[in-house]
Amino acid sequence: MTKGAALQSFFDSIMTSYAASAVPDNATLPYLTYDFITSAWDGGEVGLTVNMWFRTTSEKEPNAAVDKLSKAIGLGGVQIPCDDGVIWLKRGSPWAQSLTDATDKTIKRRYINVTAEYLTLN
Protein backbone atom coordinates (compact mmCIF):
# COMPACT_ATOMS: atom_id res chain seq x y z
CA MET A 1 0.00 0.00 0.00
CA THR A 2 1.39 3.41 -0.91
CA LYS A 3 2.04 6.03 1.76
CA GLY A 4 -0.91 8.06 0.52
CA ALA A 5 -3.24 5.07 0.59
CA ALA A 6 -2.04 4.09 4.08
CA LEU A 7 -2.73 7.57 5.48
CA GLN A 8 -6.10 7.72 3.73
CA SER A 9 -7.09 4.34 5.16
CA PHE A 10 -6.03 5.32 8.69
CA PHE A 11 -7.90 8.64 8.67
CA ASP A 12 -10.96 7.03 7.03
CA SER A 13 -11.12 4.71 10.06
CA ILE A 14 -11.79 7.83 12.17
CA MET A 15 -14.30 9.56 9.89
CA THR A 16 -14.72 10.48 6.22
CA SER A 17 -11.40 12.00 5.24
CA TYR A 18 -9.74 13.83 2.39
CA ALA A 19 -6.25 15.02 1.65
CA ALA A 20 -6.45 18.79 2.15
CA SER A 21 -5.82 19.35 -1.57
CA ALA A 22 -8.53 16.90 -2.67
CA VAL A 23 -11.79 17.86 -0.93
CA PRO A 24 -14.60 17.39 -3.45
CA ASP A 25 -17.03 20.26 -4.05
CA ASN A 26 -19.92 18.06 -2.91
CA ALA A 27 -18.32 16.99 0.40
CA THR A 28 -20.75 17.12 3.31
CA LEU A 29 -19.90 17.70 6.96
CA PRO A 30 -18.62 16.08 9.09
CA TYR A 31 -15.27 15.18 7.56
CA LEU A 32 -11.58 15.64 8.22
CA THR A 33 -8.76 16.92 6.07
CA TYR A 34 -5.09 16.12 6.47
CA ASP A 35 -1.88 17.43 4.96
CA PHE A 36 -0.33 14.83 2.69
CA ILE A 37 3.38 15.30 3.34
CA THR A 38 5.83 12.44 2.86
CA SER A 39 9.40 11.67 3.76
CA ALA A 40 11.59 8.58 4.09
CA TRP A 41 14.08 6.91 6.43
CA ASP A 42 16.30 9.42 8.22
CA GLY A 43 14.07 12.33 7.22
CA GLY A 44 13.00 12.97 10.81
CA GLU A 45 9.53 13.83 12.01
CA VAL A 46 7.17 15.65 9.66
CA GLY A 47 4.30 17.78 10.94
CA LEU A 48 0.87 16.93 9.56
CA THR A 49 -2.13 19.14 10.24
CA VAL A 50 -5.50 17.46 10.62
CA ASN A 51 -8.65 19.57 10.51
CA MET A 52 -11.97 18.09 11.57
CA TRP A 53 -15.06 19.93 10.31
CA PHE A 54 -18.57 19.70 11.77
CA ARG A 55 -21.92 21.45 11.48
CA THR A 56 -23.38 21.44 14.98
CA THR A 57 -24.29 23.71 17.86
CA SER A 58 -22.80 21.28 20.38
CA GLU A 59 -19.21 20.50 21.31
CA LYS A 60 -20.05 16.83 21.93
CA GLU A 61 -19.52 15.46 18.40
CA PRO A 62 -16.27 17.35 17.70
CA ASN A 63 -14.81 16.41 21.09
CA ALA A 64 -15.76 12.74 20.61
CA ALA A 65 -14.06 12.68 17.19
CA VAL A 66 -10.86 14.19 18.62
CA ASP A 67 -10.94 11.58 21.38
CA LYS A 68 -11.38 8.79 18.79
CA LEU A 69 -8.32 10.00 16.85
CA SER A 70 -6.32 10.35 20.07
CA LYS A 71 -7.13 6.77 21.07
CA ALA A 72 -6.31 5.47 17.57
CA ILE A 73 -2.86 7.09 17.73
CA GLY A 74 -2.31 6.06 21.35
CA LEU A 75 0.24 7.21 23.90
CA GLY A 76 3.30 5.97 22.01
CA GLY A 77 1.95 6.50 18.53
CA VAL A 78 0.71 4.03 15.95
CA GLN A 79 2.68 2.40 13.15
CA ILE A 80 0.80 2.15 9.86
CA PRO A 81 2.18 -0.39 7.37
CA CYS A 82 2.94 0.90 3.88
CA ASP A 83 5.18 0.02 0.93
CA ASP A 84 8.78 -0.47 2.10
CA GLY A 85 8.09 0.12 5.81
CA VAL A 86 5.77 1.93 8.20
CA ILE A 87 4.53 5.42 8.96
CA TRP A 88 4.79 6.15 12.68
CA LEU A 89 2.07 8.65 13.61
CA LYS A 90 2.30 10.44 16.96
CA ARG A 91 0.40 13.18 18.74
CA GLY A 92 1.83 16.62 18.11
CA SER A 93 1.85 19.53 20.50
CA PRO A 94 -0.39 21.24 21.13
CA TRP A 95 -2.67 18.32 20.37
CA ALA A 96 -6.03 19.86 19.46
CA GLN A 97 -7.45 23.36 19.26
CA SER A 98 -11.12 24.33 19.05
CA LEU A 99 -12.00 26.86 16.34
CA THR A 100 -15.24 28.34 15.02
CA ASP A 101 -16.18 29.90 11.70
CA ALA A 102 -16.61 33.68 11.84
CA THR A 103 -19.49 33.59 9.34
CA ASP A 104 -21.40 30.53 10.60
CA LYS A 105 -21.47 29.66 14.31
CA THR A 106 -22.73 26.12 13.56
CA ILE A 107 -19.47 25.22 11.80
CA LYS A 108 -16.98 23.86 14.32
CA ARG A 109 -13.39 22.95 13.50
CA ARG A 110 -10.73 21.06 15.39
CA TYR A 111 -7.16 21.92 14.41
CA ILE A 112 -4.98 18.94 15.35
CA ASN A 113 -1.20 18.52 15.24
CA VAL A 114 0.11 15.09 14.27
CA THR A 115 3.71 14.12 13.58
CA ALA A 116 4.71 11.41 11.15
CA GLU A 117 8.00 9.59 10.98
CA TYR A 118 8.43 7.68 7.73
CA LEU A 119 10.38 4.52 8.50
CA THR A 120 10.50 3.62 4.82
CA LEU A 121 13.20 3.01 2.25
CA ASN A 122 11.83 5.52 -0.22
Briefly describe each language-model feature range.
Residues 1-18, 26, 33-122:
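Charged, amphipathic alpha-helical segments and their flanking helix caps
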